[in-house]
């Protein structure tokens, strides 16, 4: 399986929106990706800021399998970012996002010189917990009513990976 990362661009807008449409039931209550052209363009605008990096996880034939974003990147003494990610139907559950996340983690630590990545995951989202666990993240705690998704404040578990832990796993 040869997964690669691409930077989201306007040329992939329609393909992205179709993948989101096809994946609505998979994403329901877990994530709210851009669903309209206007929202997608807002997403691209956000990615143009220094505090955000976006990655499309692509199959060898360039099909979109998922998205992994580094959000709220803080540099200086903190050098940290929050992860946001989601797979697209029918590519979920096949290891593509795990392969993509390994590439994003390597890029975050080596290229962008970050020190820590954090993923906040709803406790019932066992697939997401398995994903970050497989890549080496550790559970740090529980945050009640942490993030508003689909109009509801939802509890989350806090998972993190530091560069030291990542290097020790290699």
What positions do the PLM features span?
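Cytosolic beta-strand hydrophobic patch enriched in CBS
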Residues: 27, 54-59
């Amino acid at each position: 399986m040869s997964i690669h990362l691409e930077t989201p661009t306007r040329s992939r807008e329609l393909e992205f929106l179709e993948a989101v449409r096809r994946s609505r039931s998979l994403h329901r209550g877990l994530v709210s990706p851009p669903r309209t052209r206007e929202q997608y363009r807002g997403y691209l605008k956000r990615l143009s800021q220094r505090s955000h990096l976006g990655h499309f996880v692509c199959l060898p034939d360039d099909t979109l399998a998922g998205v992994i974003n580094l959000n709220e990147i803080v540099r200086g003494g903190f050098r940290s970012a929050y992860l946001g990610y989601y797979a697209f139907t029918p590519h979920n559950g096949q290891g593509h996002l795990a392969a993509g996340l390994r590439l994003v983690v390597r890029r975050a630590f080596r290229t962008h010189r970050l020190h820590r990545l954090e993923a906040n995951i709803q406790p019932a989202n066992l697939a997401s917990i398995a994903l970050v666990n497989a890549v080496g993240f550790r559970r740090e705690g529980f945050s009640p009513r942490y993030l508003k998704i689909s109009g509801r404040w939802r509890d989350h578990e806090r998972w993190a990976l530091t560069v030291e832990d990542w290097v020790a796993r290699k």
